Amino acid sequence: MAKKKKIAFGRLDLMRNDELKGRSKIKIGFVGGGPNSFIGYSHRLAARFDNRFEFVAGVFSRDINKSRKFGTSLGLDTQRCYDDYFLMAKQESKRTDGIEALGIMTPSGDHYKIAKPFIENKVHIISDKPLTATVDEAIKLEKIVKKHKIVFALTHNYSAYPMLREAKSIIEKGKIGKVMLINVEYPQGYTVGIKKKEEASILKWRLDKNMCGPSMILSEIGTHAYHLLRYVT
């Protein structure tokens, strides 16, 4: 009987699993990324790719019932589908098997207040961009991160794209000469028909300064353009 040929992804998976022998997976929880969240699905998928994380707890919606229902649909223990992030930080810190890392997938206006109680309990943070809604919050966040000596990672997803890495390599090697001018555009049209289209209305918080800070769309979307500029050059 012919031996089945393993695909490259399968071999890569096995290599990573071999590296993990004797190591426990990092227990991770999420705040945000609920039923209608595109980025929430992406983060949960990414956490499974290299088999190094175990998703065990979360808060997924401001609506308590919706949050619990969604959490259990993902296979979580009902006791670890929390009503709010503060309760989650408190309860997880009491568990011997509590979370070691937290993924934050909420509007930026909530990033600081969500991260703070977890950092104070020595939980490492993986947060969506932008860092915070205001500079003052960013400065305060930096201080507590340094005080508690945890890892705070800010996700900029486009830096993983192969074409961007190729562009970065070309520029670093000087193949196009000295870069004198950079023009970055990041067009999106989701606000068109925002009152009528359900998929658009889900994102209307980006136009609410109470949810994403005074910069609103400039920080939420503009941060992609700024990061692309800095990363590639």
Regions found by a protein language model. Name each.
Residues 127, 133, 152-154, 183:
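Hydrophobic residues in well-ordered beta-strands that form the structural core
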Residues 159-233:
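Predominantly a Rossmann-like dinucleotide-binding segment in NAD(P)-dependent oxidoreductases
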Residues 140-158, 178-181:
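Rossmann-fold dehydrogenase core element
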Residues 2-76:
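N-terminal Rossmann-like dinucleotide-binding module
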Residues 1-25, 193, 200, 220-233:
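Contiguous beta-strand/loop segments that form the cofactor/metal-binding neighborhood of enzyme cores
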Residues 80-144:
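Beta-loop-alpha module in the N-terminal Rossmann-like domain of NAD(P)-dependent dehydrogenases
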